[in-house]
């Protein structure tokens, strides 16, 4: 067998759309990064596998940015998501499509994504899972910052007020202004103590601020799902 023969790798479908006649253009998450590939005969058996939250083994062919799917098989049990857990999974997928550079390996992101899907399927509380995923994604992409110290390296004061300097860190301020975080909330986030009053809502605000600059001002469609009655 040729040493250049394609090797199957683990993957999840992030998004799929019709492409030309019976094909589909599919965005995959793999340990080697986000890959885009053409899936032939998408209306057949392969098309039934090419759906979100199903662990797959996929053989990609081609050296260009747009690959071709040579082989695709199930690699485990799908995470069956319903209701807000489903919306949460779609939110994770959209985040990865928007933030993860093509063909930039991030195996830790892949592993955390798979673990988060399982936790969503088990019915675990959504907000801590989403905040943890957002935080780890930012950190793995090089956009992370400390939660227990400010941009000057000083420890976060429980009675202090802080603002986020995006991609730099937290800066203490001494005048009230919109979008601030108090020290007790930040220290609770650092310890992942979601039982602390205000910690989860503050974490949601913090992650929105941190993500906004990297989303380029375009809203996430999946966020609207949570607002529908």
From Swiss-Prot:
InterPro entries the record matches: ARFGAP/RecO, DNA_rep/recomb_RecO_N, NA-bd_OB-fold, RecO, RecO_C
Keyword DNA damage (UniProt): yes
Pfam families cross-referenced by the UniProt entry: RecO_C, RecO_N
Entry GO terms, CC: bacterial nucleoid
GO biological process: DNA recombination; double-strand break repair
Keywords: DNA damage, DNA recombination, DNA repair
Family: Belongs to the RecO family.
Annotated HAMAP family: RecO (MF_00201)
Functional summary from the UniProt entry: Involved in DNA repair and RecF pathway recombination.
Name of the protein: DNA repair protein RecO
